[in-house]
Amino acid sequence: MFKHVTVLLKETVDGLNIKPDGTYVDCTLGGGGHSSYLLSQLTEGGKLIAFDQDEIAIQNAKEKFSSYGEQFITVKSNFRYLAEKLQEIGITEVDGILFDLGVSSPQLDTPERGFSYHHDAPLDMRMDQDAPLTAYDVVNSWSYEQLVRIFFQYGEEKFSKQIARKIEAYRENKAIETTGELVELIKEGIPAPARRTGGHPAKRVFQAIRIAVNDELKVFEEALESAIEMVKPGGRVSVITFHSLEDRICKTTFKRNSTTPQLPPGLPIIPDEFKPKLKLITRKPILPSDIELEENNRARSAKLRIAEKR
């Protein structure tokens, strides 16, 4: 069963300021938590299109929401293709779009997917099981320099060089095939005092490899710009991020699209192309409540930002 505890459920959906007869997009269907709450607020004229790369998530949602008929449409695709996939089904603008980034609990909890450092499993980490690049390819084929770069940039790992050296030396004799092998190499690359602080020692490197395998940051940046274009005036975009890299992209994109650039003084009117596209609904991110954190430990790093199309 595809179960998943949804983070910031009410805040994210209510933040879209739902119109009962509106058209909405859930870019990250997952276990269907946000979709379920959103669908419950729509009348017969309303519609929800949900994206996911995971076939299991799609099939589960089709069963779960079958009573909604044509009001609920699933799209098995990476949300980087948001605009073109919506256009394929005749939709050119929508009333709201939400993103819940990060790995859903079922993916983390399914050992053979290779996302978790708590289970020994083949090195995979693909959100889309049909995609060609796997974590095995990254760990065994990418150069020392490439590994250092992704561990540092995507994982913000202080010991990137030491860990990459351990990987490089190990794979000269044998391929690194499982998450368990990789965890041990990461531990060897981190000094003992540092291993005892800041959560699981493999957390940052696993995050970095997952981001690289799925090209997550570039995909999100492109999709967020696309979402801003597709939302109608008065429509909103809600984004939940789970680490500083995603949050920085969201914050920067929202800020750039909600500020007027420096223009020559004395202009009688601001030309349309320089008018801000967005109004910020959240100046600072919304964080999970203490009650939510008690119930769902995975919510601890979540941040929600919301913007409205002008």
UniProtKB/Swiss-Prot annotation:
GO terms for cellular component: cytoplasm. The keyword Transferase applies. Its EC number is 2.1.1.199. One of its GO terms (biological process) is rRNA base methylation. It catalyses: cytidine(1402) in 16S rRNA + S-adenosyl-L-methionine = N(4)-methylcytidine(1402) in 16S rRNA + S-adenosyl-L-homocysteine + H(+). Gene3D superfamilies: Putative methyltransferase TM0872, insert domain, Vaccinia Virus protein VP39. It holds the Pfam family Methyltransf_5. GO terms for molecular function: rRNA (cytosine-N4-)-methyltransferase activity. SUPFAM superfamilies: Putative methyltransferase TM0872, insert domain, S-adenosyl-L-methionine-dependent methyltransferases. It is an enzyme of class 2 (transferase). PANTHER family: 12S RRNA N4-METHYLCYTIDINE METHYLTRANSFERASE, S-ADENOSYL-METHYLTRANSFERASE MRAW. Belongs to the methyltransferase superfamily. RsmH family. HAMAP family: 16SrRNA_methyltr_H. This is Ribosomal RNA small subunit methyltransferase H. It comes from Bacillus cereus (strain B4264).
